[in-house]
């Protein structure tokens, strides 16, 4: 603003002392710019109203997020340009190294318009809990003598669940009496013992439908059987820090696998519990209702690899709460000798163990020896090398057993 006044007096003094057509022509040519600059300096940015619309407040990882910012005002003052910058959460780019800097900034010619819409898309949202906090607008004169900005506090939350890749060929281990038998059978029910009815859940078999109740209620109703086999599945996620997982890709794979196996087990009628082992362990009790999936997904959306102690210590206090018919699905990025001792104790209690180990290109030699010990104990082991979860369960894949 000070430079504008100095230039104005300089042009006026030049015209007064020099005189002539040229000097006064320069002064009058510069006068509209001076007046506009002065007007811009007094234009209140409080006249501008800002709103942000996000197409989805909850979505799955790798899905796009569309953001629309609308600018409106009351006074028809000519603004040569308007810069809009949405301050997106910094951890969006940090969590996804393949995601370039989000294009959440735009420059527009506003003129006499009363409304303006700015739209941008974030492709491939990474898993996490994000907070969009503020939007900044900037404007000024054509030469940059006057620049004004205002930040609008518009807080909105976006929750990105882990990506679910349905492992269609996976079914939890079947337990016969004594908890020792393991097979690849699908879930089975005692079809002669019907305890109640419930709403249809995707994945229910056609033979389970109660057609009379369906006709009476005008919605699909499924029979609830009293003695399900393979009912209890305890999904365990190990959040221990793995120094070899520098970019966190293995942990993301493990989180996605935990979500995928939970979804698959619930769809096939199992009761699912969940344990997340870290600095503060999280326990979710057994349930077979559809809302159980969302309880677990809410935790998985924001979980981080931040555990430092061996997971066997935290897991031990929950062992007594599991029935002998429980199958433990243990998901981790590394194994230790203490974990082998833990699994041996679980097997002696009659529990079945199915372990998913997210690895890099190869298994370290130290862990390979531990894997051989686990296999000899009867632990089912899946080596998860990539995101093709169904591939690890095909015949001849990475499933190992004694």
Model region roles, listed by residue range:
Residues 253-256, 295, 369:
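Generic recognition of stable, solvent-exposed alpha-helical segments in well-folded globular domains
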Residues 1-43, 306-402:
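Von Willebrand factor type A / integrin I
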Residues 24, 32-285, 327-331, 345, ...:
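An amphipathic, basic-hydrophobic helix/alpha-beta surface used to engage anionic
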Residues 87, 200, 299, 303, ...:
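Residues that form generic nucleotide/phosphate-binding pockets
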């Amino acid at each position: 603003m000070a430079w504008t006044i100095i230039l104005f007096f300089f042009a006026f003094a030049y015209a007064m002392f020099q005189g002539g057509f040229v000097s006064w022509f320069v002064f009058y040519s510069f006068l509209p710019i001076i007046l506009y600059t002065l007007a811009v300096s007094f234009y209140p940015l409080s006249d501008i109203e800002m709103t942000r619309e996000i197409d989805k407040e909850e979505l799955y990882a790798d899905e796009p997020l569309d953001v629309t910012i609308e600018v409106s005002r009351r006074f028809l003052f000519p603004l040569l340009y308007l810069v809009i910058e949405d301050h997106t959460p910094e951890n969006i780019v940090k969590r996804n190294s393949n995601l370039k800097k989000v294009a959440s900034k735009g420059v527009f010619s506003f003129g006499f318009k009363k409304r303006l819409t700015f739209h941008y898309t974030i492709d491939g949202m990474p898993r996490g809990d994000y907070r969009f906090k503020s939007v900044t607008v900037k404007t000024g004169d054509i030469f940059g003598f006057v620049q004004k900005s205002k930040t609008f506090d518009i807080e909105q939350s976006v929750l990105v669940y882990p990506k679910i890749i349905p492992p269609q060929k996976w079914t939890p281990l079947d337990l016969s009496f004594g908890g020792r038998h393991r097979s690849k059978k699908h879930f089975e029910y005692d079809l002669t013992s019907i305890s109640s009815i419930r709403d249809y859940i995707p994945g229910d078999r056609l033979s389970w439908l109660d057609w009379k109740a369906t006709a009476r209620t005008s919605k699909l109703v499924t029979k609830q059987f009293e003695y399900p086999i393979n009912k209890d599945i305890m999904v365990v996620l190990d959040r221990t820090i793995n120094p070899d997982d520098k970019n966190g890709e293995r942990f993301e794979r493990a989180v996605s696998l935990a979500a995928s196996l939970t979804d698959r087990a619930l769809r096939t009628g199992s009761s699912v519990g969940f344990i997340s082992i870290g600095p503060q362990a999280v326990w979710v009790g057994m349930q077979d209702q559809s809302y159980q999936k969302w309880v677990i997904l809410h935790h998985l959306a924001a979980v981080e690899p931040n555990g430092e102690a061996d997971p066997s210590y935290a897991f031990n206090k929950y062992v007594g709460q599991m029935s002998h018919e429980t199958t433990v699905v243990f998901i981790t990025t590394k194994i230790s000798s203490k974990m082998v001792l833990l699994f041996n104790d679980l097997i002696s209690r009659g529990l079945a163990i199915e372990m998913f180990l997210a690895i890099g290109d190869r298994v370290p030699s130290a862990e390979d020896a531990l894997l051989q010990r686990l296999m000899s104990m009867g632990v089912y082991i899946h080596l998860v090398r990539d995101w093709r979860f169904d591939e690890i369960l095909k015949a001849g894949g990475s499933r190992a057993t004694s």
